[in-house]
């Protein structure tokens, strides 16, 4: 039997992203993530939203709160709409995906990018991170 996943839904929108309109809005991200969680039987333990924060900055308040919940054992799965919503700084992205999450047993899912650490990330993830 698969372990139950206590899932954090992570959403982020920077001021620069606002020019893209509804396609990346917090509400759009929430709808996509909630639907995915329901369809995949993921137990949502919280929503973590950093509205107005750049993806190059990993000191975002709700990102840090989510990582504290990871450390406390409350979260063992993180889902974001895509890799760019999680972050836009490729060195830190690689750090989390290659070191932090595997060490802590965290499943990460980038829904729209069809990336899931449980299935193994594609070889294109480092390149996507470079160009996010």
Where are the regions that the model predicts?
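Short, structured surface patches at the beginning of a domain
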Residues: 1-132
């Amino acid at each position: 039997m698969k372990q139950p996943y206590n899932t954090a839904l992570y959403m982020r929108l920077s001021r620069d992203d606002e020019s893209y309109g509804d396609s990346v809005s917090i509400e759009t991200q929430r709808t996509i993530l909630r639907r995915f969680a329901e369809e995949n039987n993921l137990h949502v333990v919280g929503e973590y939203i950093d509205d107005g924060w750049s993806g190059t900055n990993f000191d975002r308040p709700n990102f840090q709160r989510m990582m504290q919940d990871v450390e406390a054992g409350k979260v063992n799965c993180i889902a974001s709409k895509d890799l760019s919503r999680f972050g836009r700084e490729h060195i830190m992205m690689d750090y989390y995906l290659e070191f932090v999450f595997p060490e802590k047993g965290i499943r990460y899912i980038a829904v729209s990018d069809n990336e899931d650490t449980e299935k193994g990330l594609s070889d294109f993830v480092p390149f996507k991170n470079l160009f996010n």
